[in-house]
UniProtKB/Swiss-Prot annotation:
Homodimer. This is Proline--tRNA ligase. It catalyses: tRNA(Pro) + L-proline + ATP = L-prolyl-tRNA(Pro) + AMP + diphosphate. GO terms for cellular component: cytosol. Catalyzes the attachment of proline to tRNA(Pro) in a two-step reaction: proline is first activated by ATP to form Pro-AMP and then transferred to the acceptor end of tRNA(Pro). As ProRS can inadvertently accommodate and process non-cognate amino acids such as alanine and cysteine, to avoid such errors it has two additional distinct editing activities against alanine. One activity is designated as 'pretransfer' editing and involves the tRNA(Pro)-independent hydrolysis of activated Ala-AMP. It is found in: Cytoplasm. It comes from Escherichia coli (strain K12).
Amino acid sequence: MRTSQYLLSTLKETPADAEVISHQLMLRAGMIRKLASGLYTWLPTGVRVLKKVENIVREEMNNAGAIEVSMPVVQPADLWQESGRWEQYGPELLRFVDRGERPFVLGPTHEEVITDLIRNELSSYKQLPLNFYQIQTKFRDEVRPRFGVMRSREFLMKDAYSFHTSQESLQETYDAMYAAYSKIFSRMGLDFRAVQADTGSIGGSASHEFQVLAQSGEDDVVFSDTSDYAANIELAEAIAPKEPRAAATQEMTLVDTPNAKTIAELVEQFNLPIEKTVKTLLVKAVEGSSFPQVALLVRGDHELNEVKAEKLPQVASPLTFATEEEIRAVVKAGPGSLGPVNMPIPVVIDRTVAAMSDFAAGANIDGKHYFGINWDRDVATPEVADIRNVVAGDPSPDGQGRLLIKRGIEVGHIFQLGTKYSEALKASVQGEDGRNQILTMGCYGIGVTRVVAAAIEQNYDERGIVWPDAIAPFQVAILPMNMHKSFRVQELAEKLYSELRAQGIEVLLDDRKERPGVMFADMELIGIPHTIVLGDRNLDNDDIEYKYRRNGEKQLIKTGDIVEYLVKQIKG
């Protein structure tokens, strides 16, 4: 490709509305342009990267035995009504009617469509297992699209769905998809972790997320410094302290704390160690309970894990925190003065709280706290559960090492769905025993457009993008200095361009009448891994300057050796 016949569209300045580095660099490198909130046009450089990602995904899915299909983005509402998700899905589901007043949706996912297809196409267990995938546009009407293509409304996704007659068969395909995803992200040159995850609204019995590690990530990824243990922070177990609870050394005293409405204020004003404080959060109880709320207690420096809390049988789902008005109606005190002593509703305490002694907590009286509280002396030990987020340094749940926490960007997610959708849509086949058998399902997603942004978040410097070789828009840039004035530079540039292309290498020849500084800046901005610079001075010695984008190292290579050298660097 020649720049004179290409839309490069680079920008010198960073657009003001671009928050994260991937959004900034995708705009500056001429990869995308915003059409409307959460909607982007992909320009030629962006499409080239997108196709590289797609091709790797497609190759590994095919290698894993998955079969490619293509399903419509527009889906009839009756399928969503049949599955129950018409009511369950929020405003992210874009609903509309056609000219015949028939309701439809723009698909955010395709479980209903694929299950409808399978219930009409398959009849016998002998046809299974099967795993279907597509690379297709999705639409989710995000309330606040942000971070460019990282959280856009329209995006490209690889979604796969497998069908089975047994859990054992599902597990085999699940393991194959886990391995395929690991190959996909490894081939792309990404630093990632596969982590245990909560199944969330999708449901099912098992789930793993594939997280690209990056400072800008929205998720906390937890992993052991010693073993292979890794989990999303929502799922990571906080192990109970091994040390027995220390004996009481203080009497419980009621203390006036009129200006301490938060743990931070309590600690500062009374010079308390934060590890000796407990915070109490009230959430709504499950419908039909004899009590309106449940009190959840975690140590002052810990955070409540809302996913774990929501799984408590006495807690309503979705998890809903009580308002101040609701709290006062039950406890007769505000949210800054709550604690376990004389709490009139059920209490659940975190494992760490159960091991505490001589601690401070609200007295359930406005402006007052109890200091020196001890379990079983001042208040009975209530139900104990793991309800907090882990913190760095906690013991790993597998008993090996300590936990580290890094930020991650979710680029893939695999689920064992079970029979949730097949039961709702009555998808079954004749089993081996001749009886009707509901199908067991798995689903497996990769955010293709998100992968592009995540790769940039992990691979950039002050000059621009530093693409991993496998997904770079071009492999080699040829920069001929003053080619329009120097015949030998022009002749060599054309010769190398032809020879490299004949070797199957993707080349961008910068044949613009531009200053060298502009040419260098553009090639570094768009992140082409290998650059060769042709100039009369070096050619006097039969040399060509080669530069590797990732480390910035330069070297002189003889003109007769440069093609072989580049082929070796790129193809190994």
